[in-house]
Amino acid sequence: GYLKADFTQERFHTDFTTWYLGWIASQVDLHDPAHHKHINPHQLLDNLADYDFPAYEGFLTSLGVSMHLSWHFGYFTRAQYPLGISLMADIIRSGAGKNPFWITEMQGGNVTASGREVLCPTAREITQWLWTGIAAGAEGVIFWTLNQRASALEAGEWGMLDFQGRPSDRLPAASEVARTAKAHKSFFRE
């Protein structure tokens, strides 16, 4: 009796996830073949072994990544968050293959209770994170979320708007990045 590493269960999980996502994509195609198919892996750095991104290229039309910094960036200090964004973007860009990749959940506002770390991004950080994602090749960035929920676990958190529904300083910062990227679209598409 020597101990041996047995990853049969983990391999099954990865293979089953790939099969199941492919099956879901086939069902979407059955009913709406023109519909885009996209997934948004959560906790990427902790769950990377669960995914077989190259296998997804055949049935997805784009690949995204969730970047809730207060959840997903425990390996980094706050000053290193741009490095974490770049790392996760590189992983997803590589995994997307010929398909585009998006940052489909970028933390947009404060988190005090529904994350692992208390964090309220500054307008400068939002600007830096967006440019880091764009420089890494992301075709788009979607924030979580525009406005805070009124109830439940995430109540009062994550929003780009303040508690009175007015833009926080983060929203105009994000808008300025979007305006600049749009004004120089050909440069960013090369």
Predicted regions and their residues:
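Short amphipathic alpha-helical segments, especially helix-boundary/capping motifs
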Residues: 1-4, 65-67, 105, 152-156
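Short glycine/proline- and acidic residue-enriched helix-loop micro-motifs
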Residues: 2-11, 162
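Short leucine-rich amphipathic alpha-helices used at interfaces
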Residues: 7-8, 14-15, 80-81, 86
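Aromatic-lined carbohydrate-recognition surfaces of secreted/lumenal glycan-active proteins
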Residues: 10-50, 99-110, 141-146, 190
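Short low-complexity stretches enriched in small and charged residues
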Residues: 13-24, 55-64, 151-159
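Active-site phosphate/pyrophosphate- and oxyanion-stabilizing loops and adjacent acidic/basic residues
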Residues: 26-27, 54, 90
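Substrate-binding cleft/loops of secretory-pathway carbohydrate-active enzymes
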Residues: 31, 36-75, 79, 110-122, ...
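Carbohydrate-binding surfaces of carbohydrate-active enzymes
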Residues: 77-190
